[in-house]
């Protein structure tokens, strides 16, 4: 990182955990002096709209008002990804100030996004935790679950199934395992859908579509409050926010349900 001078210029990412400082729902833009950033530490992490994009080191005390990244999912996808990148880099730098091998202090490397131990030279890169997320279809129906973290007395959000990939596991194996563990359902015809960085704090969501093969819903009660098959033409419960890969998977699956119904 460098110490900002008054004339340093560009777009500015200021983070507090997974919260960001925005001006009129946009990244602050201009010279450091005008945004009261002179003398703070920052690093350039790329460009945004043909101007430098700076990540400002998180301040312990800051009177600015910050907004949660989770409330910004409705922003254009490219802008949301920029904000997510800033949050993830900030999380990495905050949690890797000391070497995981010998315990001494680390410092940022000059030529890549990494930190290096000042004692043993061990180098660490940002940690990304791969997770799978899958929408399961059975004819005209989609499988949706109410996870315990989403439960509310009014029902809460119903969404697709998801989970972290375990050590030594392929994405495909993780999908099969998570669906069976959480609902007792076996699936087939698994195919890749898309991915989404998920900076809460450092996941990469890898999305799949799948078809039902066999089994009856049997809940993993430590994780799932409820799971049901919903027909595309019936009222649906509360769904994940627009902009999430979960919502995109649900939309794509409902379209497949409609297409199959037309062919019947």
UniProtKB/Swiss-Prot annotation:
Q: What is its EC number?
A: 3.6.1.-, 3.6.1.22
Gene3D superfamilies assigned: 3.90.79.20, Nucleoside Triphosphate Pyrophosphohydrolase
Instruction: Give a GO cellular-component term.
Output: cytosol
Chain sites annotated for binding a divalent metal cation 3: 178, 182, 223
| SUPFAM superfamilies cross-referenced by the UniProt entry | Nudix
The entry marks the following residues as binding Zn(2+), namely 99, 102, 117, 120
Q: Which residues bind substrate?
A: 112, 125, 196-203, 246
User: What is the uppermost EC class here?
Assistant: hydrolase
**Which cofactor(s) are needed, names only?**
Mg(2+); Mn(2+); Zn(2+)
Q: Does the record's keyword annotation contain Manganese?
A: yes
| Residues that hold a divalent metal cation 1 according to the record | 162, 182, 223
Q: Where is the Nudix hydrolase domain?
A: 126-253
Please give the catalytic activity noted in the UniProt record: a 5'-end NAD(+)-phospho-ribonucleoside in mRNA + H2O = a 5'-end phospho-adenosine-phospho-ribonucleoside in mRNA + beta-nicotinamide D-ribonucleotide + 2 H(+); NAD(+) + H2O = beta-nicotinamide D-ribonucleotide + AMP + 2 H(+); NADH + H2O = reduced beta-nicotinamide D-ribonucleotide + AMP + 2 H(+)
**What is the recorded name of this protein?**
NAD-capped RNA hydrolase NudC
Give the species this sequence originates from: Haemophilus influenzae (strain PittGG)
């Amino acid at each position: 990182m460098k110490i900002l001078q008054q004339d340093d210029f560009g777009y500015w990412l200021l983070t507090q955990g997974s919260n960001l400082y925005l001006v009129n729902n946009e990244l602050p833009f201009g010279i450091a002096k005008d945004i009261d950033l002179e003398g703070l530490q920052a690093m350039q992490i790329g460009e945004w709209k043909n101007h430098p994009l700076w990540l400002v080191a998180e301040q312990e005390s800051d009177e600015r008002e910050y907004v949660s990244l989770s409330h910004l999912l409705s922003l254009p996808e490219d802008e949301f990804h920029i904000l997510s990148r800033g949050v993830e880099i900030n999380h990495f730098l905050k949690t890797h100030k000391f070497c995981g091998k010998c315990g001494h202090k680390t410092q940022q490397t000059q030529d890549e996004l990494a930190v290096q131990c000042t004692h043993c030279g061990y180098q660490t890169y940002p940690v990304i935790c791969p997770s799978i997320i899958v929408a399961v279809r059975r004819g005209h129906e989609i499988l949706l679950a109410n996870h315990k973290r989403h439960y509310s007395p009014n029902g809460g959000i119903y969404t697709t199934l998801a989970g972290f990939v375990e050590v030594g596991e392929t994405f495909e194996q993780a999908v099969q395992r998570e669906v069976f563990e959480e609902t007792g359902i076996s699936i087939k015809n698994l195919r890749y859908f898309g991915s989404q960085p998920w900076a809460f704090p450092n996941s990469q969501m890898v999305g799949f579509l799948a078809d039902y093969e066999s089994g009856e819903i049997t809940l993993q009660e430590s994780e799932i409050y409820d799971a049901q098959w919903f027909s595309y033409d019936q009222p649906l419960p509360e769904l994940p926010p627009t902009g999430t890969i979960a919502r995109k998977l649900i939309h794509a699956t409902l379209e497949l349900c409609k297409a199959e119904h037309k062919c019947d």
